Amino acid sequence: MYLLNDKVAHELKKPFGKVYKELPSIEGKVVSIGDVTTKHLLSNGIIPDLSILDFKTKRNIPVDIPHKFKTIFEVENPQGCISDEAIERIKYLSTIHDRDMALIIKGEEDLLTIPVIKYFPEDTSVIYGQPDEGMVLLKITDELKQKIEKLLKEMEER
């Protein structure tokens, strides 16, 4: 389990990619992280390969996503950390060549962008919400994977 600290929290406030109000067209493998982002993609006809959700926004406002995912998995991931269970499930899901999967988080999904970048293949598009700004779209690259490895080393491991 990795625990968030102030130094890493400060780093994570900076988007890993470009912030959009409306996303451009997206091709290839897509992972969405967050309920509002996933709902936006689905309502625009974009079905992510994997959607990571907790059915809340801003920690406690319920979000209704009227979509039936093809495959659903659940894990626990407490606020402010990346649980071993979440890491292992994301690692596993990165090897599946399927679409319309959901990883339902009991807890909080905010930090799970980190293991997604670590384990999903290069050129995967990752979309997550940047509170009060829009959606961040990034393509996984080797350089980004190296940045994530550095962040993980700076987090407290338990």
From Swiss-Prot:
InterPro entries: GTP-dep_dephospho-CoA_kin. GTP binds at residues 35-36, 54, 56, 109, 132. GO terms for molecular function: GTP binding; kinase activity. It is an enzyme of class 2 (transferase). GO terms for biological process: coenzyme A biosynthetic process. It catalyses: 3'-dephospho-CoA + GTP = GDP + CoA + H(+). Pathway: Cofactor biosynthesis; coenzyme A biosynthesis. This is GTP-dependent dephospho-CoA kinase. Catalyzes the GTP-dependent phosphorylation of the 3'-hydroxyl group of dephosphocoenzyme A to form coenzyme A (CoA). The keyword Transferase applies. The lineage of its organism: Archaea, Methanobacteriati, Methanobacteriota, Methanomada group, Methanococci. It comes from the Archaea. Keywords: Coenzyme A biosynthesis, GTP-binding, Kinase, Nucleotide-binding, Transferase. The keyword Nucleotide-binding applies. Its EC number is 2.7.1.237.
